């Protein structure tokens, strides 16, 4: 029994090694070989006997990892398959990997032009199209839905800038808007095409000869107590050596008036210096008192204003006389048209004999 017990213990699955080969093949997974009263389990050449002495398993370093170019997939006892990376296919020898010409596939993986690369491919679009999310689409117009007041001009593939018509320039701080601009002594006026007599000029200019804008020479009005330089659409005043603001550029050289009009030195950050006048076309110009020769356009404006005042006074006089109950003939003579004057003369001629 003891021997049998030992034999039974030796045959148990807990005991390592093979049993007698005549009993269920010694418990070996692959092959059992007995010699000189001892039994041993054998495994295939590409497998190794495991710790229990009966099972067969893959060795730690399987030779397929050196045989396959990319990857080795083990399945079953001693079996393997070589696998290639994406973009490659297994060669005829079942071990090497060859590049796949993706562009030769049908349908083509690209919407327009396909360029095959090692292990992959690249999609390109025809001239005038852009590749967006794998699709070739018309490029987005940089000027689409712009807010330019006059005209939009593309800059590159995605930017744009607003341009203005001749005689206009972008407004500083609002480049989508345009304002009249003249950097010369005279420029064409901006006239209404339906009403050619209605024209406008840039700031610092005046209508002259109907459709021409002429620069106003502010220096002729003695507005600058120092050295005055007339500029297109504006002017600059350089204070003289007898001024507390000597050498500074502004619109007034009296420090008292400068401080009253522009604020205290604290308003300038404690420097005590008045700000430099802005660039031409943006100068805040005070209303100069006419002290020099007037321009022809100014004289025309004064004449029109005077004539309008006379007409208004005559109309007021007529209205007052009507309220006072003046005779119709006298009022019509003063305020009526020439046709009514002839009728009044006939009436007066007829009334004279009646009075006699």
Curated annotation (Swiss-Prot):
Disulfide bond listed as a keyword: yes
Residue intervals annotated with topology Cytoplasmic: 321-356
Disulfide bonds: 21-32, 28-41, 43-56, 64-72, 68-82, 84-97, 103-114, 110-123, 125-136, 143-152, 148-162, 164-178, 182-191, 187-199, 201-213, 219-228, 224-237, 239-253
Domain EGF-like stretches: 17-57, 60-98, 99-137, 139-179, 178-214, 215-254
GO molecular function term, any single one: transmembrane signaling receptor activity
Bilayer topology annotation: Single-pass type I membrane protein
Stretches assigned to the Extracellular side: 1-296
Function: Endothelial cell receptor that plays a critical role in regulating several physiological processes including hemostasis, coagulation, fibrinolysis, inflammation, and angiogenesis. Acts as a cofactor for thrombin activation of protein C/PROC on the surface of vascular endothelial cells leading to initiation of the activated protein C anticoagulant pathway. Also accelerates the activation of the plasma carboxypeptidase B2/CPB2, which catalyzes removal of C-terminal basic amino acids from its substrates including kinins or anaphylatoxins leading to fibrinolysis inhibition.
Identification of the protein by name: Thrombomodulin
Organism: Bos taurus
Gene: THBD
């Amino acid at each position: 029994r003891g021997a049998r017990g030992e034999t039974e213990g030796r045959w148990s699955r807990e005991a390592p090694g093979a049993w007698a080969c005549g009993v269920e093949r010694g418990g070996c997974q692959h092959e059992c070989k007995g010699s000189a009263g001892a039994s041993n389990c054998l495994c295939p050449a590409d497998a190794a006997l495991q710790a229990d002495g009966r099972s067969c398993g893959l060795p730690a370093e399987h030779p397929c990892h050196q045989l396959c170019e990319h990857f080795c997939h083990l399945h079953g006892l001693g079996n393997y398959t070589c696998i290639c990376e994406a973009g490659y296919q297994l060669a005829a020898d079942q071990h090497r990997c060859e590049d796949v010409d993706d562009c030769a596939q049908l349908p083509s993986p690209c919407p327009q032009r396909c360029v095959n690369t090692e292990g992959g491919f690249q999609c390109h679009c025809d001239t005038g199209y852009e590749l967006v999310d794998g699709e070739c689409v018309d490029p987005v117009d940089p000027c689409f839905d712009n807010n330019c007041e006059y005209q939009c001009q593309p800059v590159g593939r995605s930017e744009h800038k607003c341009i203005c018509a001749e005689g206009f320039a972008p407004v500083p701080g609002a480049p989508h808007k345009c304002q009249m601009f003249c950097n010369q002594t005279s420029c064409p006026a901006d006239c209404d095409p339906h009403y050619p007599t209605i024209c406008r000029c840039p700031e610092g200019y005046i209508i002259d000869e109907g459709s021409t804008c002429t620069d106003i020479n502010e220096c002729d009005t003695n507005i600058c107590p120092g050295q005055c330089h007339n500029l297109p659409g504006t002017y600059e005043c350089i204070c003289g050596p007898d001024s507390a603001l000597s050498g500074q550029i502004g619109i007034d050289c009296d420090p008292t008036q400068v401080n009253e009009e522009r604020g205290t030195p604290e308003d300038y950050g404690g420097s005590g210096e008045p700000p430099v006048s802005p660039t031409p076309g943006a100068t805040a110009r005070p209303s100069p008192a006419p002290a020099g020769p007037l321009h022809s356009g100014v004289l025309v404006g004064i004449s029109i204003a005077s004539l309008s005042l006379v007409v208004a006074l005559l109309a007021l006089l007529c209205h007052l006389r009507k309220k006072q109950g003046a005779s119709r003939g006298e009022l019509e003579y003063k305020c009526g048209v020439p046709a009514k004057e002839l009728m009044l003369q006939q009436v007066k001629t007829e009334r004279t004999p009646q009075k006699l």
